[in-house]
UniProtKB/Swiss-Prot annotation:
GO molecular function: GTP binding; GTPase activity; metal ion binding; structural constituent of cytoskeleton
Assembly and binders: Dimer of alpha and beta chains. A typical microtubule is a hollow water-filled tube with an outer diameter of 25 nm and an inner diameter of 15 nM. Alpha-beta heterodimers associate head-to-tail to form protofilaments running lengthwise along the microtubule wall with the beta-tubulin subunit facing the microtubule plus end conferring a structural polarity. Microtubules usually have 13 protofilaments but different protofilament numbers can be found in some organisms and specialized cells.
Domain of life per record: Eukaryota
Organism in which the protein naturally occurs: Euplotes crassus
Residues where GTP binds: 11, 69, 138, 142-144, 204, 226
UniProt protein name: Tubulin beta chain
SMART domains according to UniProt: Tubulin (SM00864), Tubulin_C (SM00865)
Required cofactor(s): Mg(2+)
Keywords: Cytoplasm, Cytoskeleton, GTP-binding, Magnesium, Metal-binding, Microtubule, Nucleotide-binding
Family, per entry: Belongs to the tubulin family.
Length: 446
């Protein structure tokens, strides 16, 4: 079977992860003690994508939980599904990274990383046919960003041919948790460009907007935000876990979504958006799902896809529907909005269909888009980074942990390169490919 090893790191990663396991357990009919109480054999058929079967028929998440302080893990353990996890798979330090990327990547995190790798290795060895790793973390703090990227590079060394997929929470434009977010995020992106295969870009502000605007929640909690993220993670892997007419897996996703190796930062969306607890009263149709899925207000990161063009996109539909209708809708989207898709990649939307919808819905869909508009996120972080770095503000916290200014400069230029690469393909047209003369003129005009 195609197993996935799930790793969650830092406060944000552990909170998203905990929510994700609630959603997945619900889909597979697993209760908080790990006992199966489902109503359909399909729930068990490929349950081993995310679960190991333990003695007495209990199902245990194939999850590794890491943090540099015990706090968040204690609350996960005390949470509704806390008893589900394997106790040995909690790996934590006592010091904390104090929102400092260098502590997570070079000092505190480096001391703990081997114990994390031991657990990862043990989980990977128990797999029949390991598909890859999925990691939930944030890029603004110290542990998820610093230690998270350290773990990614270590796993990359040991399992070079497995897919590495991350769900990364980027710093929000208006809401900032910590002053040094731009530093931590830039240093992390520098790593993710090189070592991750697929990065799903999420950001709290966009999630707040969705809760506020679409779900009409007046005071959204992190629980509500994480619920949205979980719906996406669950949708991405639904084809691995349930039978479908058009299957996809992490590798097919990568092949279809990544035209150039560095451009693997995706926007994600989910439809239909329903608030927790309010079930949908009328079933959506495939055209309505498609409409909502491609809506800019539906994107879980603060970039507007209308400001760029889609290089590629992927739609995963769940529920009983005709594949013909799905194909028609996908073509329809491309024809109606052709200016938002690059014309030098024809038919650039991949669709897959999984027969089993999420709990409580008849039809649902998950959207993943590789849009050049994502450069807005990077630009925003880069501006904040440069503003502080020019004055060397807060830098002593990083150099004190043994970091070199050089690494900051490299990270900065790597991120700026990424932005220009996205811009270059946004401007490219079908005729120009191969005619370098015009390219040069364009560069002058920029």
């Amino acid at each position: 079977m195609r197993e996935i090893v799930h790793v969650q790191g830092g406060q944000c990663g552990n909170q998203i992860g905990a929510k994700f396991w609630e959603v997945i357990s619900d889909e597979h009919g697993v209760d908080p003690t790990g006992t199966y109480h489902g109503d359909s054999d399909l729930q068990l058929e490929r349950i081993n994508v995310y679960y190991n079967e333990a003695t007495g028929g209990r199902y245990v998440p194939r999850a590794v939980l890491m943090d540099l302080e015990p706090g968040t893990m204690d609350s996960v353990r005390a949470g509704p599904f806390g008893q589900l996890f394997r106790p040995d798979n909690f790996v934590f330090g006592q010091t904390g990274a104090g929102n400092n990327w260098a502590k997570g990547h070079y000092t505190e995190g480096a001391e703990l990383i081997d114990s994390v790798l031991d657990v990862v290795r043990k989980e990977a060895e128990g797999c029949d046919c390991l598909q890859g790793f999925q990691i939930t973390h944030s890029l603004g703090g110290g542990t998820g960003s610093g230690m998270g990227t350290l773990l990614i590079s270590k796993i990359r060394e040991e399992y070079p041919d497995r897919i590495m997929e991350t769900f990364s929470v980027f710093p929000s434009p208006k809401v900032s948790d910590t002053v040094v977010e731009p530093y931590n995020a830039t240093l992390s992106v520098h790593q993710l460009v090189e070592n991750a295969d697929e990065v799903m870009v999420i950001d709290n502000e966009a999630l707040y907007d969705i809760c506020f605007r679409t779900l009409k929640l007046t005071t959204p909690t992190y629980g509500d935000l994480n619920h949205l993220v979980s719906a996406c993670i669950s949708g991405v892997t639904s084809c691995l876990r349930f039978p479908g007419q058009l299957n996809s897996d992490l590798r097919k996703l990568a092949v279809n979504l990544i035209p150039f190796p560095r451009l693997h930062f995706f926007m994600v969306g989910f439809a239909p958006l329903t608030s927790r607890g309010s079930q949908q009263y009328r079933a959506l149709t495939v055209p309505e799902l498609t409409q909502q899925m491609f809506d800019a207000k539906n994107m879980m990161c603060a970039s507007d896809p209308r400001h760029g063009r889609y290089l590629t996109a992927s739609a995963m539909f769940r529920g009983r529907m005709s594949t013909k209708e799905v194909d028609e809708q996908m073509l329809n989207v491309q024809n109606k909005n052709s200016s938002y898709f690059v014309e030098w990649i024809p038919n650039n939307i991949k669709s897959s269909v999984c027969d089993i919808p999420p709990k409580g819905l008849k039809l649902a869909s998950t959207f993943i888009g590789n849009s050049t508009a994502i450069q807005e996120m990077f630009k925003r972080v880069a501006e904040q980074f440069t503003a502080m770095f020019r004055r060397k503000a807060f830098l002593h916290w990083y150099t004190g942990e043994g970091m070199d200014e050089m690494e900051f400069t490299e990270a900065e230029s790597n991120m700026n390169d990424l932005v220009s690469e996205y811009q270059q393909y946004q401007d490219a047209t079908a005729e120009e490919e191969g005619e370098y003369v015009e390219d040069e003129d364009e560069m002058d005009g920029m």
